[in-house]
Amino acid sequence: MGLSLLQDRMRGIMIQLQTKFSRQVDEHNVLPEYPRPSLVRTSYLNLNGRWECAFSKTPEIPLSFDLSILVPFSPECQLSGVSRQLKPGEYLWYRRTITLAKPQQDKRILLHFGAADQTAEVFVNRISAVRHCGGYLPFSADITDYL
C-alpha cells in the first residue's frame, strides 16, 4: 500500500492521499535510477530502501533503533512507514549496515546524500565522518579512511 500524507497543522488531523506514484512504490526497489544519468559511475550502489531509525532526546547515538524507515521518504510521509513528525528538541537517527570490499589503493569511497533536512551528521563505524547544514541540499563525504 502506497500513500502520501498531508497533515493539517491547524486542526492536527492527518489526511491520507493516494496518488498514482504512491501506488507504484516498490520498497525493494525504491527510486533505483542513477541521480545524474549523464555522469553514471560503474561502481555505484543505491542505498534507497529500508533503514533502521530512532527518535531520541539526546545527541548521543541511540543504543537501539526500534523503527524502520523507507528511504528516501521523510518520516512525516506515510510512504516512509513512520508517519511521525520530529518534535522540537528531538533527534532523528538513521542506521544502515552494508559490507563493502576494500577499495583499490588509488580508489576512494564516496557517500553521497541527495538531501537532508537542515542538519545531518554522518557516522561511519560510529565515528563522525561529516557534518552538513543546509536543508534539502546534496552533500558528499569521502568515507574511505573510516572503513
Model-derived features: positions:
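N-terminal helix-cap/turn-to-beta initiation motif at the start of protein domains
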Residues: L39-N48
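Juxtamembrane "anchor/assembly" segments of surface/extracellular structural proteins
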Residues: L70-P72, E76-Q78
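Accessory beta-strand-rich segments of carbohydrate-active enzymes
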Residues: G12-I15, T19-R23, L31-E33, P37-S38, ...
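Residue-level detector of alpha-helical hydrophobic segments embedded in or interacting with membranes
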Residues: E27-P32, L67-L70
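N-terminal amphipathic/basic-hydrophobic helices that include classical n-h-c signal peptides
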Residues: M1-I13
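Predominantly extracellular/luminal regions of secreted and cell-surface proteins
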Residues: G49-V71
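Histidine-centered catalytic/metal-coordination loop motif
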Residues: D66, Q78-L86
